[in-house]
C-alpha cells in the first residue's frame, strides 16, 4: 500500500518554493523602478546605434519547426530510460512504448502531409 505521508515533505518543499517565487516576483513588481525612457527601450548593439530595427517579426515557420523539434526531442528523452529498463518491464512496457511511438509516427506523417516540414 502506498503511504502518501512519505510525499508530504515534497509537497511542503514545493509549497515553500512556490511561495518564495511568487513573493520575489511580487516584490520586484511593487518596488522596482518604473521609469522607461528612450535609452532603456532601445535595443543594445555592442555600444553602437542600431543599424536597423531589432524588433523584426519572425516567420511563423521558425516556431513550428521549434515546436516539432521539442516534441520529437522529448520522444528520445523517453526512449533512453525505456531502453534501460526494457528487460524488467516485460511485454506490457514494450507494447506501451510501441503505441506511444505509433502515435508519434502518425503525428509526424500528419505534419509531413500538411506541409509543415517544407520550407519555401
UniProtKB/Swiss-Prot annotation:
Enzyme class, UniProt record, top EC level: translocase
Membrane topology: Multi-pass membrane protein
GO cellular component, one term: plasma membrane
Reactions catalysed according to its record: a quinone + NADH + 5 H(+)(in) = a quinol + NAD(+) + 4 H(+)(out)
Keyword Cell membrane: yes
Enzyme Commission code: 7.1.1.-
Matches recorded under Pfam families: Oxidored_q4
UniProt-annotated location(s): Cell inner membrane
InterPro entries membership: NAD(P)H_OxRDtase_bac/plastid, NADH_UbQ/plastoQ_OxRdtase_su3, NDAH_ubi_oxred_su3_sf
Keywords carried by this UniProt record: Cell inner membrane, Cell membrane, Membrane, NAD, Quinone, Translocase, Transmembrane, Transmembrane helix, Transport, Ubiquinone
Subunit structure: NDH-1 is composed of 14 different subunits. Subunits NuoA, H, J, K, L, M, N constitute the membrane sector of the complex.
Its biological purpose: NDH-1 shuttles electrons from NADH, via FMN and iron-sulfur (Fe-S) centers, to quinones in the respiratory chain. The immediate electron acceptor for the enzyme in this species is believed to be ubiquinone. Couples the redox reaction to proton translocation (for every two electrons transferred, four hydrogen ions are translocated across the cytoplasmic membrane), and thus conserves the redox energy in a proton gradient.
Record protein name field: NADH-quinone oxidoreductase subunit A
Organism: Coxiella burnetii (strain RSA 493 / Nine Mile phase I)
Originating gene: nuoA
Amino acid at each position: 500500500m502506498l503511504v502518501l505521508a512519505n510525499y508530504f515533505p515534497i509537497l511542503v518543499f514545493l509549497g515553500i518554493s512556490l511561495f518564495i517565487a511568487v513573493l520575489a516576483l511580487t516584490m520586484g513588481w511593487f518596488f522596482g523602478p518604473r521609469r522607461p525612457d528612450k535609452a532603456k527601450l532601445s535595443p543594445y548593439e555592442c555600444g553602437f546605434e542600431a543599424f536597423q530595427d531589432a524588433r523584426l517579426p519572425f516567420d511563423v515557420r521558425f516556431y513550428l519547426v521549434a515546436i516539432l523539434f521539442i516534441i520529437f526531442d522529448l520522444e528520445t528523452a523517453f526512449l533512453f530510460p525505456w531502453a534501460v529498463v526494457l528487460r524488467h518491464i516485460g511485454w506490457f512496457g514494450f507494447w506501451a512504448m510501441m503505441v506511444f511511438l505509433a502515435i508519434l509516427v502518425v503525428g509526424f506523417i500528419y505534419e509531413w502531409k500538411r506541409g509543415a516540414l517544407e520550407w519555401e
